[in-house]
Protein backbone atom coordinates (compact mmCIF):
# COMPACT_ATOMS: atom_id res chain seq x y z
CA UNK A 1 0.00 0.00 0.00
CA UNK A 2 2.83 2.38 0.78
CA UNK A 3 4.30 1.96 -2.72
CA UNK A 4 0.88 2.73 -4.19
CA UNK A 5 0.57 5.82 -2.02
CA UNK A 6 3.98 7.11 -3.12
CA UNK A 7 3.29 6.27 -6.78
CA UNK A 8 -0.06 8.05 -6.73
CA UNK A 9 1.38 11.08 -4.97
CA UNK A 10 4.26 11.27 -7.45
CA UNK A 11 1.94 11.00 -10.46
CA UNK A 12 -0.30 13.76 -9.11
CA UNK A 13 2.72 16.00 -8.51
CA UNK A 14 3.96 15.36 -12.06
CA UNK A 15 0.57 16.35 -13.49
CA UNK A 16 0.40 19.46 -11.27
CA UNK A 17 3.88 20.63 -12.21
CA UNK A 18 3.71 19.85 -15.93
CA UNK A 19 1.02 21.55 -18.00
CA UNK A 20 1.62 19.11 -20.86
CA UNK A 21 0.35 16.17 -18.82
CA UNK A 22 -3.43 15.94 -18.60
CA UNK A 23 -4.67 15.22 -15.07
CA UNK A 24 -6.84 12.54 -16.69
CA UNK A 25 -3.67 10.77 -17.80
CA UNK A 26 -2.89 10.30 -14.10
CA UNK A 27 -6.49 9.18 -13.56
CA UNK A 28 -5.98 6.60 -16.32
CA UNK A 29 -2.95 5.20 -14.55
CA UNK A 30 -4.77 5.02 -11.21
CA UNK A 31 -8.34 4.19 -12.22
CA UNK A 32 -8.28 0.41 -11.65
CA UNK A 33 -7.67 0.26 -7.89
CA UNK A 34 -9.98 3.21 -7.27
CA UNK A 35 -12.76 1.74 -9.42
CA UNK A 36 -12.32 -1.73 -7.91
CA UNK A 37 -12.80 -0.31 -4.40
CA UNK A 38 -15.76 1.88 -5.41
CA UNK A 39 -17.36 -1.01 -7.34
CA UNK A 40 -16.86 -3.29 -4.34
CA UNK A 41 -18.48 -0.81 -1.94
CA UNK A 42 -21.46 -0.30 -4.26
CA UNK A 43 -21.83 -4.07 -4.75
CA UNK A 44 -21.83 -4.65 -0.98
CA UNK A 45 -24.31 -1.87 -0.26
CA UNK A 46 -26.59 -3.23 -3.00
CA UNK A 47 -26.40 -6.69 -1.39
CA UNK A 48 -27.03 -5.15 2.06
CA UNK A 49 -23.60 -6.11 3.39
CA UNK A 50 -21.08 -4.02 5.26
CA UNK A 51 -18.74 -2.17 2.92
CA UNK A 52 -15.90 -3.00 5.31
CA UNK A 53 -16.29 -6.80 5.23
CA UNK A 54 -14.27 -8.84 2.72
CA UNK A 55 -15.94 -10.68 -0.13
CA UNK A 56 -14.92 -12.99 -2.98
CA UNK A 57 -16.42 -11.02 -5.84
CA UNK A 58 -13.45 -8.94 -6.94
CA UNK A 59 -12.44 -9.10 -10.59
CA UNK A 60 -9.12 -10.81 -9.89
CA UNK A 61 -10.87 -13.46 -7.78
CA UNK A 62 -13.42 -14.17 -10.50
CA UNK A 63 -10.62 -14.46 -13.06
CA UNK A 64 -8.75 -16.84 -10.74
CA UNK A 65 -11.87 -19.00 -10.31
CA UNK A 66 -12.40 -19.03 -14.07
CA UNK A 67 -8.82 -20.17 -14.68
CA UNK A 68 -9.27 -22.96 -12.10
CA UNK A 69 -11.46 -24.67 -14.68
CA UNK A 70 -8.48 -25.01 -17.00
CA UNK A 71 -5.56 -25.59 -14.63
CA UNK A 72 -5.64 -27.57 -11.40
CA UNK A 73 -2.39 -26.12 -10.05
CA UNK A 74 -3.07 -23.14 -7.74
CA UNK A 75 0.32 -21.59 -8.45
CA UNK A 76 -0.33 -21.59 -12.19
CA UNK A 77 -3.79 -20.07 -11.69
CA UNK A 78 -2.46 -17.39 -9.37
CA UNK A 79 0.46 -16.55 -11.67
CA UNK A 80 -1.78 -16.47 -14.75
CA UNK A 81 -4.28 -14.21 -13.01
CA UNK A 82 -1.55 -11.74 -12.13
CA UNK A 83 0.01 -11.94 -15.59
CA UNK A 84 -3.31 -11.38 -17.39
CA UNK A 85 -4.19 -8.36 -15.26
CA UNK A 86 -0.70 -6.88 -15.50
CA UNK A 87 -0.54 -7.43 -19.26
CA UNK A 88 -3.90 -5.72 -19.73
CA UNK A 89 -2.78 -2.75 -17.64
CA UNK A 90 0.61 -2.58 -19.35
CA UNK A 91 -1.02 -2.47 -22.79
CA UNK A 92 -3.47 0.13 -21.51
CA UNK A 93 -0.62 2.28 -20.11
CA UNK A 94 1.07 2.25 -23.52
CA UNK A 95 -2.18 3.18 -25.27
CA UNK A 96 -2.98 6.09 -22.95
CA UNK A 97 0.63 7.29 -23.11
CA UNK A 98 0.30 7.89 -26.86
CA UNK A 99 -1.44 11.21 -26.23
CA UNK A 100 -0.91 12.01 -22.54
CA UNK A 101 -1.75 15.70 -22.94
CA UNK A 102 -5.10 15.28 -24.72
CA UNK A 103 -7.79 15.41 -22.04
CA UNK A 104 -10.62 14.29 -24.34
CA UNK A 105 -8.61 11.24 -25.39
CA UNK A 106 -7.82 10.43 -21.76
CA UNK A 107 -11.47 10.69 -20.67
CA UNK A 108 -12.49 8.49 -23.62
CA UNK A 109 -9.88 5.89 -22.63
CA UNK A 110 -10.98 5.88 -18.97
CA UNK A 111 -14.57 5.34 -20.11
CA UNK A 112 -13.55 2.57 -22.51
CA UNK A 113 -11.50 0.81 -19.87
CA UNK A 114 -14.35 0.94 -17.35
CA UNK A 115 -16.73 -0.46 -19.97
CA UNK A 116 -14.28 -3.30 -20.77
CA UNK A 117 -13.80 -4.03 -17.05
CA UNK A 118 -17.56 -4.05 -16.40
CA UNK A 119 -18.25 -6.24 -19.44
CA UNK A 120 -15.73 -8.89 -18.44
CA UNK A 121 -16.81 -8.67 -14.80
CA UNK A 122 -20.40 -9.52 -15.77
CA UNK A 123 -19.25 -12.33 -18.08
CA UNK A 124 -16.97 -13.86 -15.45
CA UNK A 125 -19.65 -13.53 -12.77
CA UNK A 126 -22.15 -15.40 -14.97
CA UNK A 127 -19.65 -18.14 -15.81
CA UNK A 128 -18.64 -18.62 -12.17
CA UNK A 129 -22.27 -18.58 -11.01
CA UNK A 130 -23.19 -21.37 -13.46
CA UNK A 131 -20.18 -23.49 -12.41
CA UNK A 132 -21.02 -23.32 -8.69
Regions found by a protein language model. Give the residues of each.
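Alpha-helical transmembrane segments
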Residues: 1-132
